[in-house]
Structures are given as structure tokens and as C-alpha cells.
Regions:
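Phosphate/pyrophosphate-binding active-site segments
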Residues: 2-5, 141, 295-395, 519-528, ...
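Generic enzyme active-site microenvironment
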Residues: 163, 300, 392, 444-445
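A glycine-rich phosphate-binding loop feature that marks nucleotide/adenosyl-phosphate handling sites
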Residues: 165-170, 396-397, 543
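N-terminal alpha/beta PP-like core and its mobile active-site loop of ThDP/TPP-dependent enzymes
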Residues: 2-339, 382, 466-469, 501, ...
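Thiamine diphosphate
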Residues: 110-121, 265-268, 292, 309-311, ...
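A structural motif corresponding to the C-terminal end of an alpha-helix
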Residues: 130, 378-387, 506-512
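Active-site diphosphate/adenylate-binding microenvironment
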Residues: 11-15, 22, 29-32, 37-39, ...
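Conserved short loop/turn motifs at secondary-structure junctions
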Residues: 219-224, 364-365, 446-448
Length: 564
């Protein structure tokens, strides 16, 4: 009598495929039809982090992808859950973070005829505009190759978000186990090196050598590349001033003598040759137009050829992955050495010192209530002594001021709203950074920004993650002193509840909460929160009149020209 065949099903196959591709964590929200998939993943040793909202789970997966160069995995239920995660998927794609969102879905035969199935939605086609790629698996024997394609697409070339649709009938479909295991694909070399053209590298070095006022701009693509040593060696060898975009802070420490961050506007307006390294000439750099010299020449190191000439003509495009491009640039520099003119560095240093003095006066002024500057000065003091901290930052004024005030000392330690300027990334990024690194995380949040994902503090407490959340509470969106123009006694459109005690939320989840009104209280609470490694909220009471509308990008917010 022959032995009975062992059977398996779709959800077991996809979990085994994840394991064989070294995926060790899933972020998600369970429900129909993926609950048992999450249970089985956990049973097989994959860490499952359950969230209160799919958007935050997706943000955590994206943060993990940025930090590890491996796709972060987000698991959602069908239709509404899928749509909740879609913002995070789009955000990953826009920012160039590798992420795979896996969603269960309803019966294709019913959905395609629009016959009213449970949570009916054509999810794959809904995802396509917002993802680097979107795939649907219609038969269980394709689960292995589908995941392999998703992994490769998410990390190769410019990284991004990939959507993988798993209908319920495919997850439940049974197959003979040994045969099913042969369909699993282990992805080899998922992100092959893309070498730049040697002539482009030579031209780039030649142009930099002729420059009188060169500048290097480091973007988050440079941070993602993990080319920290090559970038440092190149910058220090040629003595070229550099300007880090916000998530590139720390590739070289912000206190480095060649950092031009404190003279940003002057450097951008006066540089004659600018080398963009994993940075795009988008709105964050005024598209290379307003505030820039008309005759600036650009060198652009980017993995995506379509990014070249997007806003300004690029004199020397160097297309390839950043690590390979920087290796080539270093080799060429050693053959054709040069040093940036001292006069340019000296002029930048004068402007840096002048601006630093102005900032010092703001930071050292004691006020009651606190404002952004003296409160962030206290935070800076503590983080200077805790340089391994991962810093998550979102808000308007809270983001803009923290970016300028708080120095970073190590690469990939700062996560923020990024290219899209998305509010709500805070708790998801904090959880993703903590789970991925095992290190303490400090999330500096505006009170409005915190509200987008605040319920994830339960997730933080449930997993006992070492996350300290510092909420700058001025009782409003931008500011808390809005005026009711209706005269009806209603809150202003920009007002939140004044005197809210966000620290009290921690009482519900057995975390730790502090309410602080002075810089000394803030220093003590933040130091204690970090050292304790306990989930902590610090409610920082600041002046409702502190801040400006839309932070540092007021010009992007149109004003009415008629009426009130």
C-alpha cells in the first residue's frame, strides 16, 4: 500500500517562499482572507508585527526596506484594507523604498463580473498607478515565481513598492506538498550592480576639477546605497563642500567641517558646479530654479536614466547604482587629483558662522511657554549624547525646525516625511526602525502629525518597543491660535483641542507619559525615556502662537484673494 501523499496549500507555499528568500518580518493587519497566513508565518519563525491600521503597517515595511535594502513586507486584507495600505505603497514608490504589499482578495470570477462579492474590488488595477509593478496570482503553482518577481522588481534599479494580489481561492488551494515546493524560487542577486559609463565618470571628475565653487548634494538615494565610506573618502579627498538632504544627514556627520548645511541658501545660489548624488532636482531643491544661479552646471549620479534633465539640463549624467558610481569616481579621482579652492570653503565658513550665531540666539532664549527653538535645543542636547538613536520626524514647523537644529552623526538614522511630505509616517516608521535595528527610536512629532497614526502607540506598547515619542503640542495645525471667522464659536480650521494631554494616552496601554513645560523637564524626560527603553510619550507644551503656517513652505499654500 503506497504512502498517502502529503498536501499543502497556497498560504503555506507563500510563507515558505518568503522564508527561502530570507524575509524575516511581516508588518500587517489580519482579517479575511489572510489571518491563517499570518499565523503560519509566525509558526514558521517569521516575525509578525500586527498594527491597528494598514497604512502604518505599510510605512513600517517601507522604513525597513530603506534601512536594509531588502523589501519590507506589508500584509493586508482585501478591498478596504488594501486601500488603507495603498498610500504607504505609493509613498514607498515615490521615495524609492523597496516594499511589497501582499493583499488577500475576493473571488476573481465574481469580482470581474461585478456580482457583489465580499469586499469586491479589482485591486491589482487599482494599485498599478501607485506601484512600481503590480501582479496577481491566479493559480497556486505561480506563487513562487510571483514572489520572486516582486522581490526583484522592488529592489532592482530604482527601488519601489510592488503589489502582490493573492485571491482567497489561491491561498486556500491544495497541492501535493513535494511538487509545490519545487515551484518556489530563491532569488539570486536581486539587485545587480549597474556600472556607469567610464567616459561619464571621467567627464564628471574633469568638470569638478575645473570648478571654482563646487558643491555635492547628498540625497536619500545616497543614504540607501550604503556607500558611506566611498562618499566620505571622495568628499574629504577633494575637499568639496557637501549639503545633505534631510534623510541623507549623517552620511557624514552634520558637524563635519565640509558640511554646508548652515549656509544652504548661499551655497545653492553661488555654486558653479553641483554634483547630485542620489538626489533629485524636485520641489525640495526648487527644481533647480528659484534660488539657483542660471549658469550652474550639474553632474547627476542616479540609477534612473529618466531622472536626468527632469528640470535643468544635466551637463554630465552618471547613470548607475550609487555604490558602483562612487567607486568609479574615487578611482578616477586618484588618477586625476584636485582640491577645491580654499577661498570657496572660507566664504562658506563665514556664512556658516554668521547663521550659526543667529540660530544660537534663538536656541538659547528662554521663554514661557516654550517655543520650537528652545524646546528643540533641549532635545538636541540629549541626542548629542545618544548618537546611535534612530530619529523619526514629521510635522510642519516640527519637521522643518528639527531638521535644521538636530545634528545627525551616523547614516540612515533619520527618517522623515520624504519626497511626498506625507503626514502620518511617524509611528509606522518608528516601529519599522525599532523592529529592524533593535535600537531606541525617538519620534519628534507635531501634534497634528501625531494624530494621523497615534493609535499605533498600542502597537508600540504591545511589542514593548523602545520608542520615545516627543509631541510638540501647540494645539493646532501649524499654530493653535486660529480665529473663528464664522463668529459661531466654532474651532478654527487649523485649531486642535487646546491643552490636550497626549501623555495620558500611555495610561491606557501601560506605557510611560510625561507632561513637560520647561527645557529642564524635557531633557530629563527624554533622557529617562531613552535609557529605560520603555514606550514613552512626552507631551511638550509650547506656545500656541509658535510656528508659521505651512512651516518653511508657506509659498506652496495659496491664499484667497477675495472674501474673508
Amino acid at each position: 500500500m503506497s504512502d498517502q501523499l502529503q498536501m499543502t496549500d497556497g498560504m503555506h507555499i507563500i510563507v515558505e517562499a518568503l522564508k527561502q528568500n530570507n524575509i524575516d518580518t511581516i508588518y500587517g493587519v489580519v482579517g479575511i482572507p489572510v489571518t491563517d497566513m499570518a499565523r503560519h508565518a509566525q509558526a514558521e519563525g517569521i516575525r509578525y508585527i500586527g498594527f491597528r491600521h494598514e497604512q502604518s503597517a505599510g510605512y513600517a515595511a517601507a522604513a525597513s526596506g530603506f534601512l536594509t535594502q531588502k523589501p519590507g513586507i506589508c500584509l493586508t486584507v482585501s478591498a478596504p484594507g488594501f486601500l488603507n495600505g495603498l498610500t504607504a505603497l505609493a509613498n514607498a514608490t515615490v521615495n524609492g523604498f523597496p516594499m511589497i504589499m501582499i493583499s488577500g482578495s475576493s473571488d476573481r470570477a465574481i469580482v470581474d463580473l461585478q456580482q457583489g462579492d465580499y469586499e469586491e474590488l479589482d485591486q491589482m488595477n487599482a494599485a498599478k498607478p501607485y506601484a512600481k509593478a503590480a501582479f496577481r496570482v491566479n493559480q497556486p503553482q505561480d506563487l513562487g515565481i510571483a514572489l520572486a518577481r516582486a522581490i526583484r522588481v522592488s529592489v532592482s534599479g530604482r527601488p519601489g513598492g510592488v503589489y502582490l494580489d493573492l485571491p482567497a481561492n489561491v491561498l486556500a488551494a491544495t497541492r501535493e506538498k513535494d511538487e509545490a515546493l519545487t515551484t518556489i524560487v530563491k532569488v539570486e542577486n536581486p539587485s545587480p550592480a549597474l556600472l556607469p559609463c567610464p567616459k561619464s565618470v571621467t567627464s564628471a571628475i574633469s568638470l569638478l576639477a575645473k570648478a571654482e565653487r563646487p558643491l555635492i548634494i547628498l540625497g536619500k538615494g545616497a543614504a540607501y546605497s550604503q556607500s558611506d565610506e566611498q562618499l566620505r573618502e571622495f568628499i574629504e579627498s577633494a575637499q568639496i563642500p557637501f549639503l545633505p538632504m534631510s534623510m541623507a544627514k549623517g552620511i557624514l556627520e552634520d558637524t563635519h567641517p565640509l558640511s554646508a548645511a548652515a549656509a544652504r541658501s548661499f551655497a545653492l545660489a553661488n555654486a558653479d558646479v553641483v554634483m547630485l548624488v542620489g538626489a533629485r532636482l524636485n520641489w525640495l531643491l526648487a527644481h533647480g530654479k528659484k534660488g539657483w544661479a542660471a549658469d550652474t552646471q550639474f553632474i547627476q549620479l542616479d540609477i534612473e536614466p529618466q531622472e536626468i534633465d527632469s528640470n535643468r539640463p544635466i551637463a554630465v549624467p552618471v547613470v548607475g547604482d550609487i555604490a558602483s558610481s562612487m567607486q568609479g569616481m574615487l578611482a578616477e579621482l586618484k588618477q586625476n587629483t584636485f582640491t577645491t579652492p580654499l577661498v570657496w570653503r572660507d566664504i562658506l565658513n563665514i556664512h556658516k558662522q554668521q547663521n550659526a550665531q543667529k540660530m544660537h540666539e534663538k536656541l538659547s532664549t528662554d521663554t514661557q511657554p516654550l517655543n520650537y527653538f528652545n524646546a528643540l535645543s533641549a532635545v538636541r542636547d540629549v541626542l548629542r549624547e545618544n548618537q546611535d538613536i534612530y530619529l523619526v520626524n514629521e510635522g510642519a514647523n516640527t519637521l522643518d525646525n528639527a531638521r535644521n537644529i538636530i545634528d545627525m552623526y551616523k547614516p540612515r538614522r533619520r527618517l522623515d516625511c520624504g519626497t511626498w511630505g506625507v503626514m502620518g509616517i511617524g509611528m509606522g516608521y518608528a516601529i519599522g526602525a525599532s523592529v529592524t535595528s533593535g535600537s531606541p527610536v525617538v519620534a519628534i512629532e507635531g501634534d497634528s502629525a501625531f494624530g494621523f497614526s497615534g493609535m499605533e502607540i498600542e502597537t508600540i506598547c504591545r511589542y514593548n518597543l523602545p520608542v520615545t515619542i516627543v509631541i510638540f503640542n501647540n494645539g493646532g495645525i501649524y499654530r493653535g491660535d486660529g480665529v473663528d471667522l464664522s463668529g459661531a464659536g466654532a474651532p478654527s480650521p487649523t485649531d486642535l483641542l487646546h491643552h490636550a494631554r497626549y501623555d495620558k494616552l500611555m495610561d491606557a496601554f501601560r506605557g510611560v507619559g510625561y507632561n513637560v513645560t520647561t527645557t529642564d523637564e524635557l531633557r530629563h524626560a527624554l533622557t529617562t525615556g531613552i535609557q529605560s527603553r520603555k514606550p514613552t510619550i512626552i507631551n511638550v507644551v509650547i506656545d500656541p502662537a509658535a510656528g508659521t503656517e505651512s512651516g518653511h513652505i508657506t509659498k506652496l499654500n495659496p491664499k484667497q484673494v477675495a472674501g474673508n
